[in-house]
UniProtKB/Swiss-Prot annotation:
CC terms in the record's Gene Ontology section: cytoplasm
Pfam families assigned: SMC_N
CDD domains per the UniProt record, alphabetical: ABC_RecF (cd03242)
Organism: Limosilactobacillus reuteri (strain DSM 20016) (Lactobacillus reuteri)
One example of a Gene Ontology biological process annotation: SOS response
MF annotations from Gene Ontology: ATP binding; single-stranded DNA binding
PANTHER family attached to this UniProt entry: DNA REPLICATION AND REPAIR PROTEIN RECF
Location in or out of the cell: Cytoplasm
Keywords annotated in UniProt: ATP-binding, Cytoplasm, DNA damage, DNA repair, DNA replication, DNA-binding, Nucleotide-binding, SOS response
Membrane-spanning segments: none
Gene3D superfamilies linked to this entry: P-loop containing nucleotide triphosphate hydrolases (3.40.50.300), RecF/RecN/SMC, N-terminal domain (1.20.1050.90)
Gene: recF
Designated name of the protein: DNA replication and repair protein RecF
Function as written in the Swiss-Prot or TrEMBL entry: The RecF protein is involved in DNA metabolism; it is required for DNA replication and normal SOS inducibility. RecF binds preferentially to single-stranded, linear DNA. It also seems to bind ATP.
Length: 374
């Protein structure tokens, strides 16, 4: 898929802007605090309906205004599709083909995007919460069913945790409702767990090949899905549900005493193994970065495999965090394959040599100057 056009109205430091993009590489270049990352953020928000930088949508609206609009045209195999997102104090509205969507979940998946920012290099060595967020963010774009099940699980988890605290402090005494919540939570949790197992298995296949190539055949990469049920590729949703619900039943008193849900996919993790060694605990920084790069690049192929369309790739000042070898592999892998948006204060010599006919946008104080480079 290709984002051919983007329009911003009162978004961040952009008052009113329309820009047409190159189907290949688009370089957003400029000094810090000029609007490069804001532009990338707008594309990300148009894709996922939420920002990767803030959970407060009000921050997306220009401080002098009461509402903001992001719209664009995405070109897919089925044709061109207009997309629109409106933000105001009343909430968000999403439109596809000029038709307002009843729920935001119906909108997600129209424009798929993979973000690669410096913080993503911490995917390997960062917290389990970071890796769970990674799974939810990427897999939700590939499957509306996953998006729904993960959303239902989060809602029920909040409800159950609230009720557990009420039981802990004797504000409630009815355990029947707790059993109902646990049953529903186990049902949606099982769906999430089995879907994660499926997606990670496919992601591992793509990432392993890329890692071997980047490491010059010196290293092999494996991804292990760490979960309390110890599911395998053969585990069914029903089996996962029965196992998770039994954990809730067997540990009901313990959960009440702690006032929180102890088991479920909200406790899951991913383990990265390089040459059968846990790279999170024992790998060098270079191995950790190569692993993160392999996984992010593998997402591109996995999303194409699952949806039939290549996603957009958003590179937010990530080249400066990579050495020459990893820059080369990244830029070579995406060449003539996926529409790319790259922010930087200056292009490295490696990037200038490897990027084929980019469109460079010089950004200053929320304005763009476009220059074709042949």
């Amino acid at each position: 898929m290709i984002l051919t056009e983007l329009h911003l109205h009162h978004f961040r430091n952009y008052q009113d802007l329309t820009v047409h993009f190159n189907p290949g590489v688009n370089v957003l270049i400029g000094h810090n605090a000029q609007g490069k990352t804001n532009m990338l953020e707008a594309i990300y928000v148009l894709s996922l309906t939420k920002s990767h930088r803030t959970s407060n949508d009000h921050e997306l609206i220009n401080w002098q205004e009461k509402s903001a609009l992001i719209s664009g045209t995405v070109e897919k195999s089925i044709g061109k599709i207009p997309l629109e997102l409106q933000f105001s104090s009343k909430g968000k509205k999403a439109k596809v083909n000029h038709l307002e969507q009843a729920r935001l979940s119906q909108y997600v998946g129209q424009l798929n995007a993979i973000l690669f920012a410096p913080e993503d290099l911490s995917l390997v060595k960062g917290s389990p919460a970071l890796r769970r967020h990674f799974m939810d963010r990427e897999f939700s774009q590939m499957s509306s069913k996953y998006l729904y099940n993960a959303g239902q699980y989060r809602t029920l988890l909040r409800q159950k945790n609230k009720y557990l605290k009420q039981l802990k402090y004797r504000q409630q005494t009815d355990r029947v409702l707790l059993g109902v919540l646990s049953d529903q939570l186990a049902a949606f949790g099982a769906e999430v767990i089995i879907a994660r197992q499926h997606f990670l298995k496919h992601l591992e296949g793509w990432a392993a090949d890329l890692h071997q190539e980047i490491s010059l055949n010196k290293e092999s990469l494996r991804l292990e899905y760490v979960n309390q049920l110890k599911v395998s590729d053969d585990t069914t949703v029903e089996e996962a549900y029965q196992a998770l619900f039994k954990l809730y039943q067997d540990n009901e008193q313990r959960e009440i005493e702690q006032g929180t849900t102890i088991y479920g996919p909200h406790r899951d993790d991913i383990r990265f193994l390089v040459n059968d060694k846990n790279v999170q605990a024992f790998g060098s920084q270079g191995q950790q970065r190569t692993t993160a790069l392999s996984v992010k690049l593998a997402e591109i192929d996995l999303m194409k495999e699952q949806t039939g369309e290549y996603p957009l790739l958003l590179l937010d000042d990530v080249l400066s965090e990579l050495d020459t070898i990893r820059q080369t592999h990244l830029l070579t892998a995406i060449q003539n394959k996926v529409q790319t948006f790259l922010t930087t204060t200056s292009l490295s010599d490696v990037a200038r040599q490897l990027i084929n006919e980019p469109t460079i946008f010089e950004i200053e104080h929320g304005t763009l100057n476009k220059e074709e480079v042949k």
